[in-house]
Each structure stands twice: as C-alpha cells, then as structure tokens.
Amino acid sequence: MELKLNRKYKDTLFRKVFNNKKDLLSLYNALNNTEHMDESLITINTIEGAIYIGYKNDISFIINSELNLYEHQSSVNPNMPVRGLIYFAELYKGYIDQNNLLIYNERLVKLPFPRYVVFYNGTEDEPEEQELRLSDSFEKVLEGEVQRTDIVEAEANKPSVEVAVQLLNINYGCNQELLEKCQKLMEYSRFIALVRVKSDMLTEKYKKEMKSVNKKEIFADAVALAIDEAIRDNVLKDILSKNMAEVTDMLLTEFDEKAYIEGVKKQSYEEGEAKLAKLVVELKKRGRVEDIAKVTDESERERLYKEFNI
C-alpha cells in the first residue's frame, strides 16, 4: 500500500496566530523574560514557500542579534535538529548575501546567535521541557577505532557541528507560567484543548446513538463547536471571527497530516515485522539459533539483513 499526502504547504494555525510582530514580540518576551515594546526591533525572515524535508518552519525572525526559529509540532520527532540544521543553513546564507558579508575575508564575520524553539501540543504525554540535540544523530567513534593516540574517546566523539532544540509542551495546563506571560499563546493552547474536548464529546455521543461517522467528520464538527464557544469566551476571537473558514481548513489539513503520519508508522511497523520474520526463518533454516537471539540488537539485525540480502 502506497500512502500519499498533498505536500502543498498551507499555513498552520500557530503561524496564523503569531504572524504579526506585536504577538510575536509578546511570545519572544515570554520566552526570554524581556520587556521589549518596540515591534520594529523584529525582522521576520521566514523563507516563504520553502518546504524542507517535507515540512516548513512556522516563523523565523531576527531581534537583538538573535536568529530565532519557532515551530509548532503535534508530535515529537527526534530528527527536528537535522531539519533545523538545514533551515538555519538557508537562513544564514540569506543573511550573508543580504548583508554583503565577505566570508572569505580575513576579518571575522559576525552572525546573529541561533535559537531554535519547538512548541509541542500533541496528545502524547511529554515533559514540560526537553532538549533535542543534533549530536544524538551522529554515529559515535568507538574506542578501538580511534586512530590517533593523542585523542581520547571523549574528544573523538565531540562533534564539529551541533544544533540544540528547546522543546516546550504548551498543552493547556503545562508550562503555565509561560502561557500566562503570553496571552495569545494561552488562548491558542485553550482553543486546541477545546477542540479535543469537543471531539471526545462527539465521539462518545455518536457512539451512544450508534451513528456511523468517520473520524474526520467528527473532527470537523468538533472544530465548528469549538470555534463558536471560543468566540463567545473571547478566545482567539479576533482571528476566529474573521477567518472561520480558513482556520477550519487549517485544522482539517493538520488532521490529514497526522492521519498520514500515523499511517506511515503503521505501514513501516508492519513491513519491519515481515522483514524480521523472514530473517528468523532464514536463520532457522541454517541452524543458526545463536544468531536469532542477536536480532534484538539493531546493529546486529542490520548486519544480518545485509548478509541475507533482506
């Protein structure tokens, strides 16, 4: 089964909420415990229309010699630092070109300090804050493979490139102090929580009524109810009242993407199970019982896959 997803980019609700400098500055202040009031300090440099690794970042901007990359994600992906590396490279290239910086000159080129923050509001339990690092993706140099005797293992495993991602859980009830510092972030968190409450309520309602309604239809109904209630309660009222259809479309697109990702994971798991079963059969045929116990180790499993051309 081949799974497909329309990769044409659409704005996320998070980006819609923070696409103006006033609210973006409020979010920056909340994160950094600053009190900047001058919106002109912000230079937004999001690479418009650029999709990298199948995703587009939500917002990037420069303020006070800091290059900030903000993303919203509904799932925790350990490859976020890899995507960040690629996107930061593009941002710095643009900055160097725009400012006519001479990187081959003998004078040191000054660049804005990078900060990468991901705002998580998925349904899985995650800590309020965690850090993901690019170096976790790098293959480590084993002690026996260190060729130069003057380099200890710790130094050999010190990467020349690093990207650190600050991952913040903004589900309603998490990081309360941060949410209270930024009104729009609080409202965004409340609205997403409201959509989920309505979705659970409708799922239970249709189940009791024995109605056959698919998940996407339930979600669409939940979004409509959540928007109405949010407007009444003055939650993202300015955005929801003016852009009701657009917001609905954004959330349904995010729903489709989540369903796609879950489908890919399920397919990958099933394919992996079939591959593993084939390997075990081959090992049994050859009487290599001792190797069957080794398949729980990823590196050994991959070695055996290569050996049997699976």
Predicted regions and their residues:
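Elongated, amphipathic alpha-helical interaction scaffolds
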Residues: 1-310
